[in-house]
Amino acid sequence: MPSLGTMCSLLLFSVLWVDLAMAGSSFLSPEHQKLQQRKESKKPPAKLQPRALEGSLGPEDTSQVEEAEDELEIRFNAPFDVGIKLSGPQYHQHGQALGKFLQEVLWEDTNEALADE
């Protein structure tokens, strides 16, 4: 007959093994996936706030920025998606730099396409 130490060791091993098996099965179960999806759907999406031209935006300034009618939105696809939204004053201040950046990016893509041919 096995000794008391052997029996305790086997009992401890089996309890730990069952714990490990239960943890793995709960991870793979559909209920766990449903709970994860519910948790993700409850999180509100992060909303980005544009920066002011001078200083930081206060709560009263954000409504003015959101209601601005003279906004410009630029989107283009490279190996990744990029979106830029500017108000009229921001476009006048940063328009040349943005145009130069876009020309450089698009020019690199054109040069790479020509080199591949």
From Swiss-Prot:
O-octanoylated by GOAT/MBOAT4. O-octanoylation is essential for ghrelin activity. Amidation of Leu-98 is essential for obestatin activity. A lipid is attached at residue 26 (O-octanoyl serine). InterPro entries: Motilin_assoc (IPR006737), Motilin_ghrelin (IPR006738), Preproghrelin (IPR005441). The keyword NAD does not apply. The modification Leucine amide is found at residue 98. One of its GO terms (biological process) is dendrite development. GO terms for molecular function: ghrelin receptor binding; growth hormone-releasing hormone activity; hormone activity; protein tyrosine kinase activator activity. Residues 1-23 form the signal peptide. It is found in: Secreted. Keywords: Amidation, Hormone, Lipoprotein, Secreted, Signal. It comes from the Eukaryota. The keyword Translocase does not apply. Residues 31-43 have a biased composition (Basic and acidic residues). A lipid is attached at residue 26 (O-hexanoyl serine). A lipid is attached at residue 26 (O-decanoyl serine). Residues 52-75, 99-117 form a propeptide. Belongs to the motilin family. This is Appetite-regulating hormone. It comes from Canis lupus familiaris.
